[in-house]
Amino acid sequence: MQEGKKLLDFRRREMVETLKRYGITNQRVLKAFLEVPRHLFFEVEAWDAAYNDGAYPVGFGQTISQPYTVAFMTSLLVERSPSGKVLEIGTGSGYQAAILDALGYSVFSVERIVALYERAQQRFSRLGLHIACRFGDGTLGWKDEAPFDGIVVTAGAPKAPESLLQQLAENGCMIIPVGGSDAQQMTVIKREEGEFKRELFERFVFVPLVGREGWDDTVF
């Protein structure tokens, strides 16, 4: 058991070194990736794959994103909204939410697939994480808890949902992959003096953001 833990700890350190080689330099982000055991967000039989440099299926057509993707999105957020309340759209395995929690954010997360929502809730409870999670349509956000200093969308959207834009606090930012079903461009939307300013970054491939203000689930 102890040898297994040592191996997983070693592989987590290796993962962080890989993130550095890929250009992730924010020390707060790297520290969070060292602190959060990624394998605990996988089923036990998949622990060997937890620190591989790739996405991994979690069921229901969803994935836990590649470590670099999570780190890249998190870095974009930390550099623009270093503290406060963050809304995550697409809880999935719960790993991204746990990274945000380790960074000291007050984290709220919405998941549209009930089985993933329940599984994430159980993980958060077991790990002692104080993350607010609800089942629902993520494209509509969490109006009762708005405004948010940051919004992180972990699925590809045809455009930024208007409901999410309106739930951004002044000087808050949204990190969202926007584009078609084949690939999406990572986009940062900053709210300044009531206007929304966009920055465009590299392209990624995400599962679709399904919901009233996203994709229709019958399309995929």
From Swiss-Prot:
Keywords: Cytoplasm, Methyltransferase, S-adenosyl-L-methionine, Transferase. One of its GO terms (molecular function) is protein-L-isoaspartate (D-aspartate) O-methyltransferase activity. InterPro entries: PCMT, SAM-dependent_MTases_sf. The active site is at 65. One of its GO terms (cellular component) is cytoplasm. It catalyses: [protein]-L-isoaspartate + S-adenosyl-L-methionine = [protein]-L-isoaspartate alpha-methyl ester + S-adenosyl-L-homocysteine. One of its GO terms (biological process) is methylation. It is found in: Cytoplasm. Its EC number is 2.1.1.77. Belongs to the methyltransferase superfamily. L-isoaspartyl/D-aspartyl protein methyltransferase family. PANTHER family: PROTEIN-L-ISOASPARTATE O-METHYLTRANSFERASE, PROTEIN-L-ISOASPARTATE(D-ASPARTATE) O-METHYLTRANSFERASE. Catalyzes the methyl esterification of L-isoaspartyl residues in peptides and proteins that result from spontaneous decomposition of normal L-aspartyl and L-asparaginyl residues. It plays a role in the repair and/or degradation of damaged proteins. This is Protein-L-isoaspartate O-methyltransferase. It comes from Pelodictyon phaeoclathratiforme (strain DSM 5477 / BU-1).
